[in-house]
Amino acid sequence: MSKVAEIRGLEVLDSRGNPTVEVEVVLDDGAVGRAIVPSGASTGAREAVELRDADPRRYLGRGVLRAVQAVNTELCEALLGRDAGDQPEIDTIMIDLDGTPDKRRLGANALLGVSLAVAHAAAMSNGLPLFAYLGGERASLLPVPLINVINGGAHADNALDFQEFMIVPAGAPTFTEAVRASAEVFHTLRAMLKAAGYTTNVGDEGGFAPEFHAAEEALDILVAAIAKAGYRPGEDIALAIDPAASELYVNGSYVYQGEGVERSREEQVAYLVRLADRYPIVSIEDGMAEDDAMGWQLLTRQLGKRCQLVGDDVFCTHPTLLRQGVEQGMANAILVKANQIGTLSEMRETVRVAHGYAYSAVMSHRSGETEDVTIADLAVALRCGQIKTGSMSRADRTAKYNRLLRIERELGSRAEYAGALLRRR
């Protein structure tokens, strides 16, 4: 039993140049674990609260010294001498110490940093990689990447209303081949955009941000890029979209500023159905707003049997919200973001609940990422089968793909690729 001997917090930078929390945990046997917490741009109203300083004299008010102080004082004092191998106890102590339902007193960014760093330290103490420590013998399923190659919405400075357009290499035989195919499509897409006179600068998540005005423009060029790269659209590589509909929802309607169109609930559902009919789309995330329960139910009735419908803002990685959504007939999958809930134990419980209802669980990054690769290990440990971690550029994104490549190599003949599971839907 290795015990927590030291906990240190530090204010560092994320991929957007904003401050975030890094935590280092040292155990009494010398094992060390480190984690850096990401941050989102498009956030759900029911997410756990990240603690910011609100001091305009530092980082335009976005500093995290208060969260770092919570790590170095209250959280450290409460956890010193505790068994690092008892993750549920570690997380329960922190949750009780915070004492708020959304972790606003100490900050979800403080709690999550400690939670993940403890897990890393315990894994090192046991001489195991994190995925094997957390998942045991069943940790052998490599996820299908949902690769965001065209950015819009809150993630880019263009007129596209939808936030993400993704390629999904579900037809690849291995994760390694999935990465290769995706990189080839990414570079083919870059050349096509450049030839057509569009900018090839990239957005927060490493995807391109061309000055398109409608989703169809992005989907058309993606289908063409897949084919030009030598792959079969819908067979080798499919598509996924994230409308981030909560960002479009104004007074009960969906306002598309780029298109200059306003859609009712029924029109929004009909539009998504038309896109799914026309393009090889296998997954739609946040197709309806988090506050539009009737819209979610309608969309699920219309598309749920033939398309993965992922709830992000509507569920916020919370098991209670997920159970409520299942009972109401909303979605058939959940996006899993550790900082939406604030501790590793709660995130694991959410994935357990999802799998219990036969809902898919998609492990996800945030738009403000770091070099931390924990979510790659978590995707394998929890047998999520899918991961969203950005495009084929920017080191904060490719670091996660590189970690998964190493995990696949380490697993050897035990490695499975989850492509068939997604294609079977």
From Swiss-Prot:
Binds a second Mg(2+) ion via substrate during catalysis. It holds the Pfam family Enolase_C. It catalyses: (2R)-2-phosphoglycerate = phosphoenolpyruvate + H2O. The active site is at E205, K337. Mg(2+) binds at D242, E285, D312. One of its GO terms (biological process) is glycolytic process. It comes from the Bacteria. (2R)-2-phosphoglycerate binds at Q163, K337, R366, S367, K388. GO terms for molecular function: magnesium ion binding; phosphopyruvate hydratase activity. Pathway: Carbohydrate degradation; glycolysis; pyruvate from D-glyceraldehyde 3-phosphate: step 4/5. GO terms for cellular component: cell surface; extracellular region; phosphopyruvate hydratase complex. It is an enzyme of class 4 (lyase). This is Enolase 2. The gene is eno2.
